[in-house]
Regions:
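Glycine-rich phosphate-binding loop and adjoining beta1-alpha1-beta2 segment
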Residues: 87-104
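Conserved NAD(P)H cofactor-binding loop of Rossmann-fold oxidoreductase domains
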Residues: 138-141
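N-terminal Rossmann NAD(P)H-binding glycine-rich loop of SDR-like oxidoreductase domains
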Residues: 64, 69-73
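Conserved Rossmann-fold cofactor-binding substructure of NAD(P)-dependent oxidoreductases
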Residues: 114-130
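NAD(P)-cofactor binding segment of oxidoreductase domains
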Residues: 2-12, 82-89, 128, 133, ...
Protein backbone atom coordinates (compact mmCIF):
# COMPACT_ATOMS: atom_id res chain seq x y z
CA UNK A 1 0.00 0.00 0.00
CA UNK A 2 1.32 3.45 -0.96
CA UNK A 3 1.91 5.49 2.21
CA UNK A 4 0.96 8.84 0.70
CA UNK A 5 -2.13 7.93 -1.32
CA UNK A 6 -3.29 4.80 0.49
CA UNK A 7 -3.64 3.06 -2.89
CA UNK A 8 -3.03 -0.66 -2.96
CA UNK A 9 -0.29 -1.55 -5.42
CA UNK A 10 -0.70 -4.63 -7.60
CA UNK A 11 1.45 -6.40 -10.14
CA UNK A 12 0.19 -7.08 -13.65
CA UNK A 13 1.17 -10.23 -15.53
CA UNK A 14 3.59 -9.68 -18.42
CA UNK A 15 2.23 -7.96 -21.54
CA UNK A 16 3.12 -10.96 -23.70
CA UNK A 17 0.95 -13.24 -21.56
CA UNK A 18 -1.92 -10.71 -21.62
CA UNK A 19 -1.82 -10.21 -25.40
CA UNK A 20 -1.67 -13.96 -26.07
CA UNK A 21 -4.58 -14.62 -23.74
CA UNK A 22 -2.50 -16.78 -21.40
CA UNK A 23 -3.65 -14.70 -18.42
CA UNK A 24 -6.13 -11.91 -17.84
CA UNK A 25 -6.37 -8.81 -15.71
CA UNK A 26 -8.13 -10.78 -12.98
CA UNK A 27 -4.69 -12.26 -12.23
CA UNK A 28 -3.55 -8.99 -10.63
CA UNK A 29 -1.88 -9.67 -7.30
CA UNK A 30 -0.40 -7.54 -4.51
CA UNK A 31 3.24 -6.50 -4.93
CA UNK A 32 5.68 -8.39 -2.67
CA UNK A 33 9.04 -7.14 -1.50
CA UNK A 34 10.53 -10.07 -3.46
CA UNK A 35 9.10 -8.57 -6.69
CA UNK A 36 11.06 -5.39 -6.10
CA UNK A 37 14.28 -6.95 -4.85
CA UNK A 38 14.54 -9.74 -7.37
CA UNK A 39 15.57 -12.05 -4.52
CA UNK A 40 14.22 -13.34 -1.22
CA UNK A 41 13.83 -10.81 1.57
CA UNK A 42 16.48 -10.94 4.29
CA UNK A 43 15.00 -10.78 7.76
CA UNK A 44 16.70 -8.18 9.95
CA UNK A 45 15.80 -7.30 13.53
CA UNK A 46 15.88 -3.51 13.13
CA UNK A 47 14.80 -2.92 16.72
CA UNK A 48 17.80 -4.87 18.02
CA UNK A 49 20.14 -3.04 15.67
CA UNK A 50 18.79 0.39 16.55
CA UNK A 51 18.75 -0.34 20.29
CA UNK A 52 22.48 -0.97 19.96
CA UNK A 53 23.01 2.80 19.47
CA UNK A 54 21.19 3.72 22.68
CA UNK A 55 23.46 5.70 25.00
CA UNK A 56 26.41 5.60 22.58
CA UNK A 57 28.29 8.37 20.79
CA UNK A 58 27.48 7.98 17.10
CA UNK A 59 29.26 9.70 14.21
CA UNK A 60 27.43 9.84 10.87
CA UNK A 61 29.57 11.04 7.98
CA UNK A 62 27.58 12.47 5.11
CA UNK A 63 24.84 12.96 7.69
CA UNK A 64 23.06 15.55 5.59
CA UNK A 65 22.82 13.39 2.47
CA UNK A 66 19.97 11.12 1.41
CA UNK A 67 21.33 8.00 3.12
CA UNK A 68 23.04 9.80 6.01
CA UNK A 69 20.03 11.90 6.98
CA UNK A 70 17.80 8.81 7.11
CA UNK A 71 20.39 7.10 9.29
CA UNK A 72 20.35 10.15 11.58
CA UNK A 73 16.54 10.03 11.82
CA UNK A 74 16.61 6.34 12.74
CA UNK A 75 19.46 6.76 15.24
CA UNK A 76 17.91 9.84 16.86
CA UNK A 77 14.72 7.88 17.56
CA UNK A 78 16.72 5.41 19.69
CA UNK A 79 18.27 7.79 22.24
CA UNK A 80 21.97 7.85 21.43
CA UNK A 81 24.19 9.45 24.06
CA UNK A 82 25.40 11.85 21.38
CA UNK A 83 24.74 12.07 17.65
CA UNK A 84 27.41 13.78 15.56
CA UNK A 85 26.46 14.76 12.03
CA UNK A 86 29.52 15.40 9.86
CA UNK A 87 28.94 16.75 6.37
CA UNK A 88 30.70 18.95 3.84
CA UNK A 89 27.45 20.62 2.76
CA UNK A 90 26.19 23.04 5.39
CA UNK A 91 22.71 23.40 3.86
CA UNK A 92 22.00 19.67 4.11
CA UNK A 93 23.52 19.49 7.59
CA UNK A 94 21.46 22.48 8.70
CA UNK A 95 18.22 20.98 7.36
CA UNK A 96 18.63 17.67 9.22
CA UNK A 97 19.78 19.55 12.34
CA UNK A 98 16.59 21.63 12.36
CA UNK A 99 14.41 18.58 11.74
CA UNK A 100 16.01 16.56 14.54
CA UNK A 101 16.01 19.49 16.99
CA UNK A 102 12.26 19.90 16.44
CA UNK A 103 11.45 16.21 16.75
CA UNK A 104 13.95 15.29 19.49
CA UNK A 105 14.60 18.40 21.64
CA UNK A 106 16.48 16.36 24.27
CA UNK A 107 18.87 14.85 21.70
CA UNK A 108 22.54 15.65 22.28
CA UNK A 109 23.15 16.69 18.68
CA UNK A 110 26.43 18.03 17.33
CA UNK A 111 26.65 19.19 13.71
CA UNK A 112 30.12 19.64 12.24
CA UNK A 113 31.08 20.81 8.78
CA UNK A 114 34.08 19.28 7.06
CA UNK A 115 35.33 16.69 4.63
CA UNK A 116 36.35 13.08 5.10
CA UNK A 117 39.26 14.01 2.82
CA UNK A 118 40.72 16.09 5.66
CA UNK A 119 42.45 13.68 8.05
CA UNK A 120 43.34 16.46 10.54
CA UNK A 121 39.67 17.46 10.81
CA UNK A 122 38.68 13.85 11.40
CA UNK A 123 41.37 13.47 14.08
CA UNK A 124 40.09 16.56 15.91
CA UNK A 125 36.54 15.20 15.86
CA UNK A 126 37.64 11.81 17.19
CA UNK A 127 39.76 13.44 19.91
CA UNK A 128 36.94 15.73 21.03
CA UNK A 129 34.02 13.28 20.84
CA UNK A 130 35.47 9.74 20.92
CA UNK A 131 32.73 8.06 18.85
CA UNK A 132 31.70 4.52 19.77
CA UNK A 133 30.17 3.81 16.36
CA UNK A 134 30.72 5.34 12.92
CA UNK A 135 28.16 5.20 10.14
CA UNK A 136 30.05 6.26 7.02
CA UNK A 137 27.70 7.60 4.35
CA UNK A 138 29.87 10.40 2.91
CA UNK A 139 30.45 9.48 -0.70
CA UNK A 140 29.99 10.58 -4.26
CA UNK A 141 27.32 8.18 -5.48
CA UNK A 142 26.31 9.35 -8.96
CA UNK A 143 28.42 7.05 -11.11
CA UNK A 144 27.92 8.85 -14.47
CA UNK A 145 29.22 12.10 -12.93
CA UNK A 146 32.14 10.33 -11.29
CA UNK A 147 33.12 8.65 -14.55
CA UNK A 148 34.02 12.09 -15.89
CA UNK A 149 35.74 13.07 -12.61
CA UNK A 150 37.43 9.86 -11.41
CA UNK A 151 40.09 11.70 -9.38
CA UNK A 152 37.40 13.36 -7.28
CA UNK A 153 35.64 10.03 -6.74
CA UNK A 154 38.89 8.43 -5.59
CA UNK A 155 39.80 11.33 -3.29
CA UNK A 156 36.40 11.34 -1.64
CA UNK A 157 35.23 7.73 -1.72
CA UNK A 158 38.54 5.90 -1.35
CA UNK A 159 40.85 8.29 0.49
CA UNK A 160 38.01 9.63 2.65
CA UNK A 161 37.14 6.10 3.74
CA UNK A 162 40.83 5.38 4.32
CA UNK A 163 41.08 8.45 6.58
CA UNK A 164 38.12 7.25 8.63
CA UNK A 165 39.55 3.74 8.95
CA UNK A 166 42.90 5.13 10.14
CA UNK A 167 41.25 7.36 12.73
CA UNK A 168 38.87 4.60 13.85
CA UNK A 169 41.81 2.28 14.40
CA UNK A 170 43.85 4.93 16.21
CA UNK A 171 40.95 5.84 18.51
CA UNK A 172 39.78 2.22 19.00
CA UNK A 173 36.27 2.79 17.66
CA UNK A 174 34.14 -0.24 18.55
CA UNK A 175 32.02 -0.45 15.37
CA UNK A 176 32.08 1.06 11.92
CA UNK A 177 29.52 0.62 9.16
CA UNK A 178 30.07 1.89 5.62
CA UNK A 179 27.03 2.65 3.47
CA UNK A 180 27.45 2.57 -0.25
CA UNK A 181 25.91 1.10 -3.32
CA UNK A 182 27.63 -0.60 -6.18
CA UNK A 183 26.93 0.27 -9.77
CA UNK A 184 28.74 -0.99 -12.80
CA UNK A 185 30.29 1.93 -14.71
CA UNK A 186 29.06 2.41 -18.28
Amino acid sequence: RDRETGCELKILPGMYQLVNGEVNVSKLRPVNIDDLLGREEISVNMEEILNYVSGKTILVTGGGGSIGSELCRQIASHTPGKLIIFDIYENNAYDIQQELNMKYPELNLIVLIGSVRDYNRIEKIFAAHKPDIIYHAAAHKHVPLMESSPNEAIKNNVLGTYNLVLAADRWKVKKSVSYTHLTLPT
